[in-house]
């Protein structure tokens, strides 16, 4: 439908215009498919993910329109993204490593570029590797991705390192990532690497400043 199409194509900058279009279409009895709420949630999620990249003026312009959109479609507002302040201890409240990873990602990983801390960058690297190796099948894999993967080895020995057996396990998994964009052990190996990374971050709650990286990804 025209309404669903407009919602699915919306970006942050077009939210005010989207509100006007939605109001017009709904006033003229636009047919609802049941998928509109999902798109509004997507729009809100994208807005919060990029909140840290927007100026305060841009947020002040777009956020009220986003709130109108939530109300218009009866959608619970997406929680505001709270970014790490750069100096407090890094903490999580969840119990499973998967949920802890998600919390660390939301807290420490910026919407674009490298993180400010080694902990955040280790989490970011795991996320990037999972997306490229599992979701994309390694189609974009190049020397820069390889360097990024190998850098994780150096991150996990900083501060309070993993114990010797865990360091060896992480190193073996990283060494099993080939220059063809494949990982020995597949999804299970990458999940274990991510679990070990989360464990290392939780052993190092104090922020470790990240130096300039040797990769651009």
Locate the predicted segments by residue.
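Ankyrin-repeat boundary/"N-cap" motif
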Residues: 1-12, 34-52, 85-95, 109-139, ...
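Ankyrin-repeat helical core positions
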Residues: 7, 26-27, 55, 71-74
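Ankyrin repeat domain, specifically the short helix-to-loop turn at the C-terminus of the second helix
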Residues: 17-32
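Short amphipathic alpha-helical segments that mediate assembly, nucleic-acid/protein binding
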Residues: 18, 59-66, 80, 101, ...
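Surface-exposed polar/charged interaction patches
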Residues: 57, 72-76, 107-114, 132, ...
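Non-catalytic, alpha-helical, charged scaffold/linker segments
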Residues: 57-99
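Charge-dense, extended regions
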Residues: 155-217
């Amino acid at each position: 439908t025209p309404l669903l199409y407009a919602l699915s194509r919306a970006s942050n900058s077009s939210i005010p215009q989207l509100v006007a279009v939605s109001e017009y279409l709904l006033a003229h009895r636009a047919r609802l498919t049941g998928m509109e709420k999902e798109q509004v949630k997507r729009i809100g999620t994208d807005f919060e993910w990029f909140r840290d990249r927007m100026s305060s003026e841009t947020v002040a312009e777009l956020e009220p329109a986003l709130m109108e959109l939530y109300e218009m479609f009866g959608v619970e507002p997406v929680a505001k993204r709270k970014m790490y302040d750069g100096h407090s201890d890094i903490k999580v409240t969840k119990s499973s490593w998967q949920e802890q990873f998600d919390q660390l990602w939301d807290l420490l990983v910026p919407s674009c570029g490298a993180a400010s801390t080694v902990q955040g960058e280790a989490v970011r690297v795991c996320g990037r590797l999972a997306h490229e190796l599992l979701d994309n099948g390694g189609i974009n894999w190049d020397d820069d991705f390889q360097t990024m993967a190998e850098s994780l080895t150096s991150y996990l020995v900083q501060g309070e390192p993993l114990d010797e057996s865990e360091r060896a396990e992480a190193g073996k998994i990283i060494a099993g990532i080939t220059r063809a964009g494949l990982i020995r052990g597949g999804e299970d190996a990458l999940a274990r690497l991510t679990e070990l990374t989360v464990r290392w971050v939780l052993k190092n709650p104090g922020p470790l400043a990240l130096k300039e990286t040797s990769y651009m990804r």
